[in-house]
Amino acid sequence: MNAHVIDAFDEIVLAFLKTRTGMEVSEYLDFNIGSLVNYIGRDPKELMEKADLYFLNPATFFPAEVKESAENFWGLELGSLERYQDELTAVTKLVPHHNFTAFRKRPFFRTNGTCIAIHPCFVQEKLEAGLFWTIFHTLQHDTERDALFRLWGRLFETYIIETLAAAAKGKNQFLPFPKYRDNNQEAFDGILSDGKICVAFECKAGFLKAESKFSEDPKLLIPDLEDKFGSSKSGALRQIASNITQVFNKNRTQRREIDGLDLSKVHVVVPILVVQEKFVSSPLTAYFLADSFRSELRKQRLVRDIDCQCPSLVVMDAYDVEALRVSNSNSAFDLLNCVFERSRLGDQVYDFHEFLIDYAKVKGISLKSDSVMDGKIKAIFERISERFFHRPVSDNAEQAI
């Protein structure tokens, strides 16, 4: 990951979390994983037959050596009946049976000296978008929150593009954060090309409002989708369409060239939108965004027409991108061919991950974790073991035997 991005994140955002909660980000994540292991490390049948295993004692669950950090962690994660009641009965635009915000904030319910996870999924979410909101809720000023949104967006872009580069490695040409030759401004977040087919990637880490997702009211959802991801001035679809018409202008004398990449013989450009929220990449919202992109491209072409084909917009999320990287450990996988095949299917109500599963079956590709992913997971658990037990995971396993 780019050093300047991590430095900015360390200096600004991590300082907020450490100062106001007493925990560093890696420490907070380790405690979340440690508590989550109690549930995912067991057979569901065992939890159903022995309900007491579902309860944790906040005072003793983590080792005594990390007591202060454990208290800080539980201070963020424990919810009470009174707190839940206040939040769940507050007047909002959310449909009550979709309103789990209180449980997402504090996924452990305090009960007479012990606690119970409302649902392990709420704990797991703290390792994803929940981390953002945990940091967000520690911030006190709009300037701090704005800084967090900008930095989180840049981190998301950087992570996705690095992962896509790994998914494309060994085949075709992938250019991260390509810039226009005339002014050195960024054109797309990433470009993949074989000289004839080009894939243009745009990443968007924005969050939809809770009322947009959970009110069951299209009048709230659609404007929010358009504003953050669609054809608004800062919307991702408008950016993609505008840059496509500039790079592939039918009037070749007015084309804007990408530095370090020859696209003069490209006859097909595939637009890809990578989002953070699964809600945005879900089949119905992806279909809406694909249709919205088609309309936006038509408007842009009235000003600058293009001389290449532009099939359907493909919408995917971070989970899909990680699956694409794993797929590239198989020699039969080709990222450009994969997304081109999905784009050729048109604006269908078809989840990208479902498509990828079908595509992998046809190509004989495994979507299971590979050695790279296994190595990263092992490194995380080694770090957790050192934090809580001051020894490697292998030593813990030997003692258990």
Q: What would you call each of these model-derived segments?
A:
Residues R150, R154-T158, R181-N184, S234-A241, ...:
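Conserved structured core elements
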